[in-house]
From Swiss-Prot:
GO terms for cellular component: brush border membrane; cytoplasm; cytosol; extracellular exosome; focal adhesion; heterotrimeric G-protein complex; melanosome; membrane. This is Guanine nucleotide-binding protein subunit alpha-13. A lipid is attached at C14, C18 (S-palmitoyl cysteine). Keywords: Cell membrane, Cytoplasm, GTP-binding, Lipoprotein, Magnesium, Membrane, Metal-binding, Nucleotide-binding, Nucleus, Palmitate, Phosphoprotein, Transducer.
């Protein structure tokens, strides 16, 4: 009977895997699982839409990223909102210190001389304390300074200094928070969605946010825009689908915080010229966001862009004329005018509905261009 039994070698040929040891079977299972994972990852990477947010410091990149979380993510729960409270308190104290210092340097008299003591109190704030150095202020500390801040903001001297803010560096959201001191001073204060959008903390390093729209994976990458942070940009250039280049359109009359000499719009134009003419991005759709339209609309009423850009033609107090000029300034930075079209949008990053509508159009543009690239591969 034994003569009719097939040998082990015949069995292994006829039924591979039947005689595998438990260790070999486990190894084979793991190998198949790894192959599946690699296949899924390859499919994911091929479908992934990687969007790079670029632009000079304070152009609105981080605010735009917050909006993506609000619109396409899980929004900010109570715990996440509370984490912004120390940053907001820091924004207020830093902003008031800037105004007190500016009032003195601009030789603006106090409306009420007794506010000098409040000004001295603000300037004595220890900015080198551990939390303050990180751009955060505890509730307990903020409440100690709140009466002084409230008195100073009501002083005509500080108000006059604020009116001349283009002559020094002041955060754009300072007025919003100073106008809401009562809310900020409540013991159970929890930042609102608008508070979070206006809270300012400089971006250090690289921040990514992943989300899906109709089963299409998106990865949005925000890199610091200050000069010291731009060397990190090159770390993010791999496999980029699209670049959203943000510009603070209202800053045509302001200078950089870094050197206090270079015009901010000129700086943005120079950065854009480097990006748009880089061969690495020859197949990447570049979309220009002329941001802070709300502030630009206010500014053109009182400041003439022609005083800063002599080549401007048109009505300097007409928003549409100024916006048309800004678009042309950026278009003219492209050396190859025959390359892919330059898309542009006028945005207000703190306005959720505006960003929702704009990004809907941007998403369609990106996906359309991405599909064309995939078909050419």
């Amino acid at each position: 009977m034994a003569d009719f039994l097939p040998s082990r070698s015949v069995l292994s040929v006829c039924f591979p895997g039947c005689l595998l040891t438990s260790g070999e079977a486990e190894q084979q299972r793991k190998s198949k699982e790894i192959d599946k994972c690699l296949s899924r990852e390859k499919t994911y990477v091929k479908r992934l839409v990687k969007i790079l947010l670029l632009g000079a410091g304070e152009s609105g990149k981080s605010t735009f990223l917050k909006q993506m979380r609000i619109i396409h993510g899980q929004d900010f729960d109570q715990r996440a909102r509370e984490e912004f409270r120390p940053t907001i308190y820091s924004n207020v104290i830093k902003g008031m210190r800037v105004l007190v210092d500016a009032r003195e340097k601009l030789h603006i008299p106090w409306g009420d001389n007794s506010n000098q003591q409040h000004g001295d109190k603000m300037m004595s704030f220890d900015t080198r304390a551990p939390m303050a150095a990180q751009g955060m202020v505890e509730t307990r500390v903020f409440l100690q300074y709140l009466p002084a801040i409230r008195a100073l903001w009501a002083d005509s001297g500080i108000q006059n200094a604020y009116d001349r803010r283009r002559e020094f560096q002041l955060g754009e959201s300072v007025k919003y928070f100073l106008d809401n001191l009562d809310k900020l001073g409540e013991p159970d204060y929890i930042p609102s969605q608008q508070d979070i959008l206006l809270a300012r903390r400089p971006t250090k390093g690289i921040h990514e946010y992943d989300f899906e729209i109709k089963n299409v994976p998106f990865k949005m990458v925000d890199v610091g825009g200050q000069r010291s942070e731009r060397k990190r940009w090159f770390e993010c250039f791999d496999s980029v689908t699209s670049i959203l280049f943000l510009v603070s359109s209202s800053e045509f009359d302001q200078v950089l915080m870094e050197d206090r000499l270079t015009n901010r719009l000129t700086e943005s134009l120079n950065i854009f010229e480097t990006i748009v003419n880089n061969r690495v991005f020859s197949n990447v759709s570049i979309i220009l966001f002329l941001n802070k339209t709300d502030l630009l609309e206010e500014k053109v009423q009182i400041v003439s862009i022609k005083d800063y850009f002599l080549e401007f033609e048109g009505d300097p107090h007409c928003l549409r004329d100024v916006q048309k000029f800004l678009v042309e300034c950026f278009r003219n930075k492209r050396r190859d005018q025959q390359q892919k079209p330059l898309y542009h949008h006028f945005t207000t990053a703190i306005n959720t509905e505006n960003i929702r509508l704009v990004f809907r159009d941007v998403k369609d543009t990106i996906l359309h261009d991405n599909l064309k690239q995939l078909m050419l591969q």
